[in-house]
A protein has these predicted regions:
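Extracellular glycan-interacting surfaces
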Residues: 1-393
Length: 393
């Protein structure tokens, strides 16, 4: 029978939740890296035992961790497998993320725009998102703050920036969102290794069609009333983008305000918020087998980062947007004031698609029936930053 492995990154460690295909009884492993912020964990689709993790600390900085046995043991790439993953400073070059500032690469950028419009030095702070290759377990991409895209081709031992992204002519005008200037979304297109999508808060969405050498903004149709030019080429605070692998080029976006859709690889977007009670939010995802079935969690506002009316409701559209239904069975509908962050929802690929999300007060909820009913598979974790799912044979 198939198994499901849920990877939860939290403010104070990582947790791994495992169940069989029925998804009723869960085993919990963790906390791994107790006390550390674990921004993101994700497994390789080629080798499910290979899991990459972003570990960060205000004291010791950024550390990349890797497991080659499904999360049982961890090591920093470049150190021997089985070496203690103890707290402390980075122990290998795998944790060096150095911006490329050479003019020869097309990215001689040293500053970007700050909140007040002044220029601010580009500084590496942390890895927000890790995206393993669809074809090679040793290739992995990292989206970082301050916003840039890095790639490793040796299992996370060495990292090199793809400088064409920051080298795009708009780079000096990028500025942070409320959570920092982070590259938080990376989507690799199945069957087309040259195409990739990324999203930056608050610069917008970008696409490459040549493997990362050059990039174009894909923000046509977005409207952001909080920037000087609401329809500008860049400057939009994109919170997350999702794509069903069976339909590359059809993208769904949760923006700072507005839920959006593109049917042409991001060249043009249209609003699909429809009857949502509020179209502010962070997460968005797509059913594994129904590419027109989309999930969001509306949040009351950009100043009140909790669910609308104190009710935790996932909204589902079976029509690709505009028509939304509230999914409440098993979710608290009174005095609930939680948030669901941008990387904290995922789906499995079992025949009956499972949906998973984590909250800022430490619950991880699961639905084994496409969202019709929900159960907390774990409670009282630290605030959940990210949720990823592996479907195991």
């Amino acid at each position: 029978m198939s198994k499901v492995r849920v990877l939860a990154g939290t403010r104070k460690g990582a947790f791994i939740l495992t169940a069989d295909g029925k998804r009723r009884n869960w085993e919990i492993s963790g906390p791994h890296f107790a006390g550390w912020e674990m921004y993101h964990l994700k497994g390789s689709p080629v080798d499910p035992n290979r899991i990459y993790a972003s570990q960060t600390s205000g004291w010791f900085g950024q550390i990349i961790q890797r497991s080659d046995d499904g999360g049982k043991t961890w090591h920093q790439p470049g150190t021997p497998p089985g070496a203690p993953a103890a707290p402390g400073p980075p122990k290998s070059d795998s944790n060096k993320f150095v911006y490329d500032t050479s003019a020869e690469t097309g990215a001689p950028l040293t500053t970007h725009q700050f909140y007040d419009g002044t220029q601010h030095p580009w500084e590496f702070k942390r890895v927000w998102h890790l995206e393993p290759s669809l074809t090679d377990p040793n290739v992995v991409y990292a989206g970082v703050e301050d916003a840039a895209l890095f790639r490793s081709t040796d299992g996370g031992e060495n990292w090199h920036e793809l400088p064409g992204l920051r080298g795009h002519g708009t780079g000096p005008n990028w500025q942070p969102g409320a959570g920092g200037m982070c590259l938080h979304t990376i989507i690799l297109e199945p069957g087309n290794p040259e195409r990739m999508y990324i999203a930056i808060s608050a610069a917008g969405a970008f696409r490459t069609d040549d493997g990362g050498k050059s990039w174009k903004p894909i923000n046509q149709g977005l409207y952001s009333k909080y920037i000087p030019n609401p329809t500008a080429e860049i400057g939009h605070c994109v919170h997350h983008i999702a794509m069903n692998p069976s339909r590359p080029g059809v993208l769904f976006m949760q923006k700072h305000w507005d839920v959006m859709r593109s049917d042409n690889a991001g060249d043009q977007w249209k609003k699909i918020s429809g009857n949502l009670p509020t179209d502010f939010g962070f997460v968005i995802d797509v059913h594994a087998h129904e590419p027109e079935t989309v999930y969001v969690v509306p949040i009351k506002s950009d100043s009140e980062h909790f669910v609308h009316e104190g009710k935790l409701r996932v909204y589902r559209s079976r029509t690709g947007g505009n028509e939304w239904e509230a999914l409440t069975n098993g979710l608290p509908q009174k005095d609930c004031y939680v948030n669901v962050l941008r990387d904290a929802m995922a789906v499995d690929s079992l025949d009956e698609c499972g949906i998973y999300f984590g909250t800022t007060v430490g619950q991880v909820y699961a639905s084994a029936d496409g969202g019709d009913s929900w159960n907390p598979i774990v409670r009282d974790l630290p605030a959940v930053l990210s949720v990823e799912v592996q479907t195991l044979a």
